[in-house]
Amino acid sequence: MYTLIWSPQFTRTARNFTKHHPELRPRLAAVLRDMERDPFQPHLRFHHLGGKLEGIQAVRLTYEYRITLTVMVTEKEIILLDIGSHDEVYR
């Protein structure tokens, strides 16, 4: 099991995200549960980012929305950084 750590930015954006997309609350809860179990499950589409976001990873919430994060494998911690549309989180 991994520990999810909500950064202040993720807490803020997740609150706003779920306010504007209440239909995605169950999907977000399911993705976070799956990430706690194993963030490398194929259906999460875990991937490393490049360029100015090098060192950050992302998982897919839906086709349009992503969650950016940092995984510290040695401590089994996942630091949640941002949530939003593809363009919003990869800016």
PLM feature segments, named:
Residues 2-9, 46-49, 54, 91:
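Basic nucleic-acid-binding interfaces
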Residues 3, 12, 16-25, 61-91:
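Enriched for short, Lys/Arg-rich terminal
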Residues 5, 19, 36-39:
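Compositionally biased, intrinsically disordered/low-complexity regions enriched for serine, proline
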Residues 25-33:
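PIN-domain endoribonuclease scaffold, especially VapC-family toxins
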Residues 30, 51-54, 69-72:
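Short alpha-helical linear motifs
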Residues 33-59:
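A short, surface-exposed loop/turn module that caps and links secondary-structure elements
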